[in-house]
């Protein structure tokens, strides 16, 4: 199951955990309050997992691929890592399922503070359209993840500030309706 916490303001190595001191864990309920949902699945059975099939059907995730992020497998590795870590939003939900390895998704809470979400094998997460976020590997420098989409894939990131998009406006409206 994913683990989450509030981050410190350090600019040291982004691959480190960056816990606030004292630590401030973030619960799954707190993640849901910012629109982030998570699932724990059996990554060893992803090709035939009925639970994954059910999630895909219920959410109309009709397209998927698998990406491996490692210096030996991802073209333009260093450049891609910088792009992934730039704070941005998407106009569609972002769905990721970790099949191997581990990494961090960072998302903003209602007060614009960073929440770090640690994901490892078997963890699946959905980030709502319009949420500011970023991704980085952890110190293992490796992740293999399934990317899921409703319809054709769109990977266009809109770097912050991107408040003028309808997806962002809808997300901000969602935040005002949650406790």
From Swiss-Prot:
Binding locations of Ni(2+)? 88, 90, 94, 133
Q: Which SUPFAM superfamilies match?
A: RmlC-like cupins
Query: What's the encoding gene here?
Result: adi1
| Enzyme kind, highest EC tier | oxidoreductase
Protein function: Catalyzes 2 different reactions between oxygen and the acireductone 1,2-dihydroxy-3-keto-5-methylthiopentene (DHK-MTPene) depending upon the metal bound in the active site. Fe-containing acireductone dioxygenase (Fe-ARD) produces formate and 2-keto-4-methylthiobutyrate (KMTB), the alpha-ketoacid precursor of methionine in the methionine recycle pathway. Ni-containing acireductone dioxygenase (Ni-ARD) produces methylthiopropionate, carbon monoxide and formate, and does not lie on the methionine recycle pathway.
| Cofactor(s) it depends on | Fe(2+); Ni(2+)
Which keywords does this chain's UniProt record carry? Amino-acid biosynthesis, Cell membrane, Cytoplasm, Dioxygenase, Iron, Membrane, Metal-binding, Methionine biosynthesis, Nickel, Nucleus, Oxidoreductase
Pfam families assigned to the protein according to its UniProt record, in alphabetical order? ARD
GO MF term (any one): oxidoreductase activity
What name does the UniProt record give this protein? Acireductone dioxygenase
Q: A biological process (GO) annotation for this entry?
A: L-methionine salvage from methylthioadenosine
Q: What is its main location?
A: cytoplasm
- Family of the protein in this entry: Belongs to the acireductone dioxygenase (ARD) family.
Recorded catalytic activity of this chain's protein: 1,2-dihydroxy-5-(methylsulfanyl)pent-1-en-3-one + O2 = 4-methylsulfanyl-2-oxobutanoate + formate + 2 H(+); 1,2-dihydroxy-5-(methylsulfanyl)pent-1-en-3-one + O2 = 3-(methylsulfanyl)propanoate + CO + formate + 2 H(+)
> From what organism does this protein derive?
Xenopus tropicalis (Western clawed frog)
The pathway noted for it is: Amino-acid biosynthesis; L-methionine biosynthesis via salvage pathway; L-methionine from S-methyl-5-thio-alpha-D-ribose 1-phosphate: step 5/6
Oligomeric and partner information = Monomer. Interacts with MMP14.
The entry's localization annotation reads: Cytoplasm; Nucleus; Cell membrane
**EC nos:** 1.13.11.54, 1.13.11.53
Q: Name one GO cellular component term.
A: nucleus
């Amino acid at each position: 199951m994913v683990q989450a916490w509030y981050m410190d303001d350090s600019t040291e190595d982004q691959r480190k955990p960056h816990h606030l001191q004292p630590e401030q864990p973030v619960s799954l309920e707190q993640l849901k309050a910012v629109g982030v949902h998570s699932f724990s699945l059996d990554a060893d059975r992803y090709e035939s997992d009925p639970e994954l099939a059910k999630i895909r059907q219920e959410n109309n995730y009709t397209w998927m691929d698998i990406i491996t992020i490692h210096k030996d497998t991802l073209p333009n590795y260093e450049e891609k890592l910088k792009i992934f870590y730039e704070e941005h939003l998407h106009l569609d939900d972002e769905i990721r399922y970790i099949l191997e390895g581990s990494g961090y998704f960072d998302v903003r809470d209602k007060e614009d503070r960073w929440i770090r979400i640690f994901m490892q094998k078997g963890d699946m997460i959905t980030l709502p359209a319009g949420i500011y976020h970023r991704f980085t590997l952890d110190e293992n420098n490796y992740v293999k993840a399934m990317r899921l989409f409703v319809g054709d894939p769109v990977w266009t990131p809109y770097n912050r500030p991107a408040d003028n998009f309808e997806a962002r406006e809808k997300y901000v409206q969602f935040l005002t309706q949650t406790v």
